[in-house]
Amino acid sequence: MIDVELPNLMQVRAFIRVAELGSVSRATEVLFRAQSVVTRAIAELEARFAVPLFERHANGMRLTDYGECLLPRAQRVLAELDGVPSLLGTAQGEPLYLFQARRLQVFVKLCETRHMQTVARHFGLSQPAVSAALKVLEGGCGQPLFVRTSRGLQPTVASRDILFPIRRALNELRLLDSDLSAMQGTLRGVVHVGALPLGRSRILPDAILRFTAQHPQVRVVTNESPFDLLATELRVGDVDFVLGALRPHDYASDLVGEPLINEEMVVLARRGHPLLHTHLTLKGVHQARWVLPRAGSPARQLLDNCFAAAGLTAPWPVVESADLAVIRGLLVRSDMLAAVSAHQLAYEIASGELQRLPLALPGTARAIGLMQRSGCLQSPAAVALMACIRQVITEQA
């Protein structure tokens, strides 16, 4: 079941048109609705948010501070939905068949589960109600969105084309309440953080502790998926931002990185390792039993390049892993070596359980920072958590 009822999209649409045109009467001309219907939509939306969105004047409607706060994100919701017809190659115009939040949620969940009964249970609906919602969407789109097969519902190309903007629209819609709460002086809601290995061991926990102490009504959810999956979640708004090793500028034009700190990789070994107090060279450790990042990962490529610059072939790993618990367990129980960022195992290094070998790995420096979707409008809570991350990094530097 869904706990929080999203704002009514038709009411949000009416709010935007009245705000843009300055009066209910002018808005009715573009909404093709009776004045009483538009007036009621505004009143119900104000009741939903429990704040006045407009000041009523004899010559029209003027946004209150609350209305000004909500308008930018509300416009982003409609912009995402208004762009769907062009993705489908259909006639332009307002796609009113999309202006029902539960219908959009059903579509997204069907794309995820590909099973109508599962979606019905999730939303507390009957299966015929789910079928009816899908029928309305397919009628508006003018083409099938799913094909029924022995393996369940399979999304069509059209479904895949419109899924991202619909997910973004729903995520923007969810943030309207958070925007309003922030304006009233209290941060509420949920911040979804993509946590890559270089940021999640020390930087992110310290920042979350600081943030939740300051804003106890905000919940933080971390996502530890691989970067490519996090990038997709970032693009659709399911993740607010990603903390970790930044990718090159040419990785994707729609993602923006903010470097906060640079750090070279180090070679770690257990306490008392026989190589700790010897003069080491890359050639001398080339044949060691290595625990290395996975082949093809940015960290592994940097490490391979480091050895290549010294005229050596890439070291052959006994184990490939990015899991810190696995790496730690292997190192403390053997004479294996691991090449990682010091941030990743900072507590083990500080306690002396793991120790750095006196060996530099030139050319392996990586920028650690924040990555966001280009042009996104972050929630106030996400902005505050990113500020805490910047503070923590500044203090730890």
Swiss-Prot record:
Origin superkingdom: Bacteria
Pfam families for the chain: HTH_1, LysR_substrate
GO terms assigned for molecular function: DNA binding; DNA-binding transcription factor activity
Domain HTH lysR-type stretches: 7-64, 99-156
Matching InterPro entries: HTH-type_LysR_regulators (IPR050950), LysR_subst-bd (IPR005119), Tscrpt_reg_HTH_LysR (IPR000847), WH-like_DNA-bd_sf (IPR036388), WH_DNA-bd_sf (IPR036390)
Any GO CC annotation of this UniProt entry: cytosol
Keyword DNA-binding applies: yes
Keyword Transcription regulation applies: yes
Listed SUPFAM superfamilies: Periplasmic binding protein-like II, Winged helix' DNA-binding domain
Biological-process GO terms, alphabetical: catabolic process
Annotated keywords: Aromatic hydrocarbons catabolism, DNA-binding, Repeat, Transcription, Transcription regulation
UniProt DNA-binding residue ranges: 24-43, 116-135
Role: Transcriptional regulator for the galBCD and galTAP operons, encoding genes of the gallate degradation pathway.
Family note: Belongs to the LysR transcriptional regulatory family.
Protein name: HTH-type transcriptional regulator GalR
